[in-house]
C-alpha cells in the first residue's frame, strides 16, 4: 500500500462510517439528553454519603438539577429548580421540586431517573450486569470515602 498524502487523508472513505459530527453537534447532544439520558436510570451517589437524616446530594442529569435527600420517608429524589449550582446551594426545601423515581440498589448506589413513568426497575434495566460482583457489593455495607 502506498503512503497516504494530504489529499488521501481528507477524502471520505468508501465505507460506511459514523461522522465525527455526532460528537460535537449541539442538536445531537440535545436529542441524546431528551431521548436517552432523561429516560434511563443514572447512579447518582452512594447511600453512605447521606446516612444521616437531612443529608442530601445534588447533581445534574440530562441538564436537569436533581437532589437526593435522606428524609423521614427514606431516600427521595427531586427535580429541583432551586439549586443554584450542582455544588448544592439550596434556596428552598427540596420537597418543592417534582419528585422523581429513585431506588437504592447494587451495593447501595442511589439510582434516579427523570422519566415520570419508567417502564423498568433498576434491576430490570441493569439486566444482570451486576450479577458477577453481587456477592462482593451486596454482602456487607460499603462506605464511600474521599481523599481530600
Walk through the language-model features, giving the residues of each.
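Short cysteine-rich loop/turn motifs with clustered Cys
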Residues: 78-85
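Rieske [2Fe-2S] iron-sulfur-binding subdomain
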Residues: 1-76, 88-148
Amino acid at each position: 500500500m502506498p503512503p497516504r498524502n494530504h489529499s488521501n487523508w481528507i477524502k471520505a472513505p468508501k465505507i460506511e462510517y459514523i461522522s465525527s459530527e455526532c460528537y460535537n453537534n449541539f442538536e445531537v447532544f440535545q436529542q441524546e439528553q431528551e431521548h436517552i439520558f432523561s429516560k434511563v436510570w443514572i447512579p447518582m451517589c452512594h447511600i453512605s454519603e447521606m446516612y444521616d437524616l437531612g443529608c442530601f446530594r445534588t447533581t445534574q442529569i440530562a441538564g436537569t438539577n436533581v437532589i437526593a435527600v435522606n428524609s423521614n420517608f427514606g431516600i427521595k429524589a427531586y427535580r429541583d429548580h432551586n439549586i443554584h449550582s450542582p455544588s448544592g446551594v439550596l434556596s428552598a426545601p427540596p420537597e418543592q421540586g417534582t419528585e422523581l423515581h429513585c431506588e437504592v440498589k447494587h451495593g447501595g448506589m442511589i439510582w434516579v431517573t427523570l422519566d415520570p413513568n419508567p417502564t423498568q426497575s433498576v434491576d430490570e434495566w441493569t439486566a444482570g450486569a451486576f450479577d458477577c460482583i453481587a456477592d462482593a457489593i451486596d454482602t456487607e455495607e460499603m462506605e464511600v470515602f474521599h481523599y481530600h
